[in-house]
Structure formats: structure tokens, C-alpha cells
């Protein structure tokens, strides 16, 4: 009988411990996700080169969230949570320090350095350390962790940043249409370079489309579709190249202290050209599916 009572007491204690550890982990997870969510907003601003006045309020909000979370996590004073609380507290503190000092200073720079990518890498490492500790705690106490929408968003951000960084690392200057045009035309006037790029793409796309239409009228629909696909990829490539060049010239090159607003307007007009081309292509594809294309031109 005594052994049975001891067993029941042990089971009850284990159940209470499991409930307590699960509840505490959920609390820590909620507090971490609050900081992660606002940090994701900050990263969006950093990677799209938002102005300082738009990102600073987010930094201040992040600091306010952290102060409340710090007090909430500090209430967990059981021995089981000691390591979890220490790791989470230390890493959240570093996140706030890097954001409130280094990042805020960087936002005031003109032109800005490449610290934005460094900052994102630091955030990924610090949140990764927190996640590793939380997973270890969950494993130790047999708690099931579920990935929230906030965590999914943050992970997707990190994947996107890694992808773009890898893409830029593998790109040479000769791959840039603007860089090529600059060497051929011999001018550094960005308005002229963007205009030349637009005309080049426009001429090339017209050439490709005329070939594609000719194949369609001759009944070679497979080749027609292949040309249409190539045309879409051409527009996407040119659009991406233009955006990358604009961003690089505006923020990364030290010799450009400022970029005239006319340059930005020129780039926007060029991008709107690509948008219109895509809309026209969508209409043509709809007519192609419905077998309602215009008649072949008379020879």
C-alpha cells in the first residue's frame, strides 16, 4: 500500500511538473515571438532601405516590448527554467542592443554601408540560439513545439535574404545591363542609362515576340509557347536587374552622395513599362487559350 501511495505521488508530481514546464515554455515562446515579430518588421525596413524616420519608431517599439518581456520571463525562477531563462534573456538583450545602437547609427548614415546584411545575419544567429535552447528544453520535458505564423514568417525572411545574397555573390559586373551600357555609351548619367536599357529590352522583346507569333501562325504552337516563356523570363530578368542596379547605385556606392529624384522617376517609368508588357502578355495568353487570336498578317 505504501509503495502504491509513493507511486501515485510520483505520478502526480510528474504530471504537475510536466504541466508547469509546458506552461512556462509557452510563456517564454510568446515573449520571444513578440520581439521576433517586431524584428521582422524592422528587417523588412532594413532590406528595402526604408528611411530612418520609418524604421526608428519600430526600434523604439521593439525596446518597449523587450522591457515588458524581460519582466515576464524574470518571474520564472524555478530551477528547471534557469538555463532557458538565462539563454533567452542574454540573446534577447543582444538583439535589443544591436538594434538600438548599431542599426540605429547605420540608419543615419548617407550613403549607407552594407551593415544591413550583417544585422540580419546577427538576428538570425541570436534567434537561432534561442530556438535551439527552447527545443532542448522541450525535448527534455517531452513538450511538443509548434511553429507559429510569426516563426514561419521570420524563417521565410531568412531564406529570402540568403537566396538574394547568394544570387548577388555569383553575379559579375558584366551581368549588369546598366554596367554594360555605361561602358558602351560612355556616360554616367543614370537617366540616359535607364532609357537605353528600356529601349534595348523593348527592341529585344519585340524581336522575340515577332518570332513567336510567326511560329504560331505556321502552326508550330510548341515553339510559340517556348518563345512566350522566354519573353516572360526576359522581362522578369530585366526588371530584377533594374531594381538591383537602382538599389546598388542609390545606397552602396560611396561616390554617389545623392541620387536625383528624376533618376528614381525614370526607373519607375521603366518598371511600369515592364508591368504593361506583362499585362499585354496575359491578354494574349488568354486569347491563345480560347483560340481567339487575331488573324495572321497578310503576306
Predicted regions and their residues:
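Bacterial Sec-dependent N-terminal signal peptides
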Residues: 1-25
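Residues marking helix boundaries in flexible regions
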Residues: 9-12, 202, 209
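Intrinsically disordered, low-complexity segments enriched in Ser/Pro/Gly/Ala and basic residues
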Residues: 11-13, 21, 28, 38-39, ...
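C-terminal amphipathic alpha-helix
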Residues: 20-56, 102-193, 237-299
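N-terminal, post-signal-peptide region of Sec/Tat-exported proteins
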Residues: 41-78, 190-204
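Short amphipathic alpha-helical coiled-coil/interface segments
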Residues: 59-66, 88-92, 96, 123, ...
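Short, solvent-exposed, charged loop/turn and helix-capping segments
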Residues: 67-91, 101-114, 205-229, 243-247
Amino acid at each position: 500500500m505504501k509503495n502504491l501511495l509513493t507511486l501515485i505521488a510520483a505520478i502526480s508530481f510528474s504530471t504537475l511538473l510536466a504541466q508547469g514546464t509546458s506552461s512556462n515554455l509557452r510563456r517564454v515562446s510568446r515573449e520571444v515571438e513578440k520581439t521576433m515579430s517586431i524584428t521582422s518588421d524592422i528587417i523588412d525596413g532594413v532590406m528595402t532601405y526604408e528611411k530612418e524616420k520609418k524604421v526608428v519608431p519600430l526600434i523604439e517599439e521593439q525596446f518597449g516590448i523587450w522591457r515588458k518581456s524581460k519582466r515576464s520571463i524574470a518571474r520564472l525562477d524555478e530551477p528547471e527554467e534557469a538555463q532557458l531563462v538565462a539563454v533567452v534573456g542574454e540573446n534577447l538583450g543582444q538583439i535589443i542592443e544591436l538594434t538600438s545602437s548599431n542599426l540605429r547609427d547605420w540608419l543615419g548614415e548617407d550613403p549607407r554601408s552594407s551593415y544591413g546584411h550583417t544585422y540580419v545575419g546577427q538576428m538570425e544567429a541570436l534567434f537561432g540560439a534561442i530556438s535551439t535552447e527552447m527545443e532542448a528544453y522541450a525535448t527534455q520535458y517531452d513538450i511538443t513545439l509548434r511553429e507559429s505564423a510569426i516563426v514561419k514568417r521570420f524563417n521565410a525572411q531568412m531564406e529570402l535574404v540568403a537566396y538574394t545574397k547568394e544570387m548577388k555573390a555569383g553575379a559579375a559586373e558584366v551581368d549588369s545591363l546598366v554596367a554594360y551600357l555605361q561602358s558602351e555609351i560612355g556616360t554616367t548619367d543614370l537617366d540616359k542609362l535607364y532609357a537605353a536599357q528600356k529601349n534595348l529590352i523593348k527592341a529585344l522583346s519585340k524581336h522575340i515576340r515577332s518570332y513567336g507569333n510567326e511560329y504560331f501562325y505556321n502552326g508550330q504552337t510548341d515553339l510559340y509557347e517556348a518563345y512566350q516563356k522566354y519573353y516572360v523570363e526576359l522581362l522578369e530578368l530585366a526588371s530584377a536587374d533594374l531594381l538591383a542596379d537602382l538599389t546598388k547605385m542609390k545606397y552602396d556606392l560611396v561616390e554617389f552622395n545623392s541620387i536625383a529624384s528624376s533618376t528614381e522617376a525614370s526607373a519607375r517609368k521603366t518598371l511600369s513599362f515592364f508591368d504593361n508588357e506583362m499585362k499585354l502578355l496575359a491578354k494574349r495568353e488568354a486569347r491563345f487559350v480560347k483560340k481567339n487570336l487575331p488573324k495572321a498578317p497578310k503576306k
